[in-house]
UniProtKB/Swiss-Prot annotation:
Main localization category: cytoplasm
Stated name of the protein: 2-dehydro-3-deoxyphosphooctonate aldolase
GO BP field: keto-3-deoxy-D-manno-octulosonic acid biosynthetic process
Gene name in the database record: kdsA
Residue ranges of coiled coil: none
UniProt family annotation: Belongs to the KdsA family.
Organismal lineage: Bacteria, Pseudomonadati, Pseudomonadota, Betaproteobacteria, Burkholderiales
Cross-referenced InterPro entries: Aldolase_TIM (IPR013785), DAHP1/KDSA (IPR006218), KDO8P_synthase (IPR006269)
Regions crossing the membrane: none
Keyword Cytoplasm: yes
Pathway it works in: Carbohydrate biosynthesis; 3-deoxy-D-manno-octulosonate biosynthesis; 3-deoxy-D-manno-octulosonate from D-ribulose 5-phosphate: step 2/3; Bacterial outer membrane biogenesis; lipopolysaccharide biosynthesis
Subcellular localization, as worded in the UniProt entry: Cytoplasm
One example GO MF annotation: 3-deoxy-8-phosphooctulonate synthase activity
Catalysed transformations (reactions): D-arabinose 5-phosphate + phosphoenolpyruvate + H2O = 3-deoxy-alpha-D-manno-2-octulosonate-8-phosphate + phosphate
EC numbers, comma separated: 2.5.1.55
Length: 284
């Protein structure tokens, strides 16, 4: 699959979707994107910057949601203009899609909306690549139905069907907890869509702090290594210059000054894994 200006798949190095959870300010966004660009260029990692203009799914009505669509999209546009990076952001309603698609290179659907057929259809008809997040409540094999919905809508609109990714971000495990089943990554390959692993939301503790979500960022490297060893097309990670001061999802964000070391390990592992054949089908 061609994504932005690079090829993605299990026969290619993993690509990275990374950035802050939410757009907090223009300067911090440009600085964070610039630092990530430097790291990824050094390691030859294809990179898409991500951040949200609005966090519609919040634990509390008093939680910070963002700078608003107009200002958030303007800032993401500056990332493209100043740094030459492709950008991704999530959309939350059908009404937002046209305006968002006019700015960003890749759309993302929130996990909780993966079963909303009209919403998935509308995103697919945008003409943009779409990173479709698997709901925390969904079995991995059920993502085939979601991807098929997107492909059907694209085909009916006369657009390419080869623009959709399936993203794993953990599954609910009791109250206020998520777990990641690495078998899901292999199962989701059966969608014939590139599989992306979200290593930071997978360590989230949803609503775990009462009015906000907690997280266990110390396990991000553990799950990221496991996903790369399993074999993925891409990784998704949120980062922040100072996670303790992040306005959204700080507890599961990777400190920006640790991203380089983490990615260096993951690149080495990815190269070793993809030099050898995947044996899953040989065991049937």
């Amino acid at each position: 699959m061609k994504l932005c200006d690079f090829e993605v798949g299990l026969d290619q190095p993993f690509f990275l979707i990374a950035g802050t959870c939410v757009v907090e300010s223009e300067q911090m966004t440009i600085d964070t994107a610039g630092r990530l660009k430097e790291i990824c260029e050094k390691l030859n990692v294809p990179f898409i910057y991500k951040s949200s203009y609005d966090k519609a799914n919040r634990s509390s009505g008093k939680s910070f949601r963002g700078l608003g669509m107009d200002e958030g999209l303007r800032i993401l546009g500056e990332v493209k203009r100043q740094l030459g990076l492709p950008v991704l952001t999530d959309v939350h309603s059908i009404d937002e899609i046209e305006q968002v698609a006019s700015v960003v290179d890749v759309l993302q659907t929130p996990a909780f909306l993966c079963r909303q057929t009209d919403f998935i259809h509308a995103c697919a008809r945008s003409g943009k690549p779409v990173n479709i997040k698997k709901g925390q409540f969904l079995a991995p094999h059920d993502m085939k139905n979601v991807i098929d919905k997107a492909r059907d809508a694209a085909r009916d609109a006369g657009l390419s069907e080869d623009r959709f990714m399936a993203c794993e971000r953990g599954v609910s495990f009791g109250y206020n907890n998520l777990v990641s089943d690495m078998r899901s990554l292999a199962i989701m390959r059966e969608t014939n869509a590139p599989v992306v692993f979200d290593a930071t939301h997978s360590v989230q503790l949803p609503g775990g702090q009462g009015t906000s979500s907690g997280g266990q960022r110390e396990f991000v490297p553990v799950l990221a290594r496991a996903a790369v060893a399993t074999g993925v097309a891409g990784l998704f990670m949120e980062t922040h210059p100072n996670p303790a001061e992040a306005k959204s999802d700080g507890p599961n964000a990777v400190p920006l000054n640790r991203m380089g070391a983490l990615l260096e390990t993951l690149v080495t592992l990815d190269q070793a894994v993809k030099r050898n054949p995947f044996l899953e089908n040989d065991f049937n």
